[in-house]
Amino acid sequence: MASELLPPPPPLPKLPSTTTMATITTTLSADGSAATTIITTTSNAITASTTSTATTISSLSDDDLREIFLRLPDLPALVRAALTCRSWLGAVRSNPAFRRLFRALHPAPPIGFFLDLTGPTNPLFVPLRPSDSDAIAALRRGDFFLTSLPHSFCGWSVTDCRDGYILLWNGMNNLGGNDMSLATLNPMTWAVDILPLPGPGGIEAGSSNNFAVLGFHLQCSDEKPGVFRVICVCTDQNMVRAVIFSSETRDWVIQPWVDIGENNSLKFRAGSLVDGSVYWPCHGKGRMVRINIGTLDTSVVDLPGQVEVDGYNFKAGETKDGKLCIVYQSGLSLDVWIRSMDGEGAEIWAPQSTHNLSAEIDRITHAGHLHGYIKMVQVRYGYVYLSKTCMTLAGMQHSWFFSLSLETLKLELLHEGKYDGYVHLYVMAFPPSLVADDGSTGHDAEGSH
């Protein structure tokens, strides 16, 4: 339990002071000798202390505190400050606008990633910040080995990581069957939620033999910890449909099929969730499908003329300030566009930058002589995450995992090792103790990590 700051000390009391004055008188007698007389006078006086009004930390208003908190370097520093006392915690919990601004100014970097492995096994977690004491402390407390998941013969596979939660599946080839499960897991709290599945045949109703599930996405609520939606995207020839699960209603809503105008060219696990919409690129085409989760509107977005989606060379994502962007890789060159408005209010793709990665990647990997390929992993919070995989001369597979800032164009090596597969970044979310979704100020919240 966080303790309150001590109140300012009371002013010093008025204390009596004693003043002593001595008078020395010297006289001469008739015989010439000197006589000295000392007269001492003592008086008591009241001396008043001077009290000045000073500003102390306990006299700061909530607005002043929040202005100071915005200057903290990161989320762990804010957590430590907020849990110092009840009034500081209340200043954070009572103001959603402050939390949104803090998230925008201090986006939390990923502390690691989950790597899907082949075979019936759970994903492997790879830490990215071994020198960060806050990240290491979080990893030690959390369930990053996924031991709280129920046993699955097929193993679990990560499909999305967002706001501190992981979305996992198993038995993907038989959606709705007895061997299929969906689960969310918060490694920091060890909380597991096994989700109910759509009713038999409901998700496939109205489809042909070309029905397929493309993947799942997780949408969380910043201000309601534990509240989330799961978006399942399905395809059938030239049609797509979204099936949405709500953690509040514990039910799935199956949307109608929408004709996107051409045969199926949407690939497994290729989608991105950006600002409340799912974007799925059309393989071999210059466009992508957009599904707005809020309005349930499905539309097609044309891409810049030079973009041709092929495998892992394209990803939709978000800039640091939350704008939709796309990143296209051709050879070792990355092109970036941001969704903007022209002078007439029409949506356009505004070119942002072109960056040649060849020299920088070769300098870092010393593998320019090896044949390999680049895979676009994710574009989030203004960073492009990508990997390069090569086959060494000894016949061993080796991979490097990078981040590229869209703002500074700085390439940074995050990890290297003998791995390949689907990578899912994990970012810590705001602790529930700092969020009040019931209007409370959090005076009874307990301090923790």
Language-model region placement:
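N-terminal entry/capping and adjacent linker segments that precede and initiate structured domains
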Residues: 1-449
